[in-house]
Amino acid sequence: GARVWAEQMGTVPVASITATKLRWLADAEPENAARVAAVALPHDWLTWKLAGGPAAGLDALATDRSDASGTGYFSTPRGEYDREILDLALRRDTSDVLLPRVLAANGEAGVTVEQGPIPAGIKLGPGCGDNAGAALGLEMGVGDVSISIGTSGVVAAVIGTPAADPTGTLAGFASATDSFLPLAVTLNGSQTLDKMRELLNVDYAEFDRLALAGTPGAGGMTLVPYYQGERTPNLPRATASLLGMTLTGTTRENLARAA
């Protein structure tokens, strides 16, 4: 069940992980699932192309533990692929399917070949996932927490041991180094602010001013920002609501603050 998934793999199956997408491929396009020779993530493919692509061979594919931990068939706690999960995802024996080498943060994924303006001989790192890259750039250490509001909303923390959450609220990912990076990710991020800013017909600076001028608690209003459904919690058909509106509390300032 979900607890075993969380403890053994670090994540529970959700629509965003690679294993789930491979199961869709196996069910919707079985002929293509049967042809799969390798499975790689976008940044793995880009690194591979820089290193020569087909000329380098599929064996040249490489990744890092942070992105691998989001596939669903890489065990974050054990630090290795689980072929049984990949078999289940593609509904076939995948012993002939190549998976990228998982490199350390300071590992070398290859060197560039000359392509247009790109010179030959530049060492290539393994890259990392977006949130792992953010944690690396912020120089986060064990115990540090970050909040990112972009296309999605992300709360990330660096911890020293693997996280296991059977509810799926936290995804037990790995960091780009040797620590772990559990994530709580919402589908609705900056678009929540953008929609309210659009309704108030103000620019970002004025929107900030309005929110700061609002009263603590936004005059009793609560915005449930499920404009596109939601992934955490898993409510794909949910819609947004603005609750607690009163004649005195419903002001431009409090609307901005509620968002």
Where are the regions a protein language model picked out?
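Short helix-boundary/re-entrant hairpin motifs in multi-pass inner-membrane proteins
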Residues: 85, 100-102
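Active-site core segments that coordinate phosphate-bearing ligands/cofactors
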Residues: 2-10, 16-60, 68, 72-88, ...
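A short coil-to-beta-strand element that immediately follows conserved catalytic motifs
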Residues: 95-99
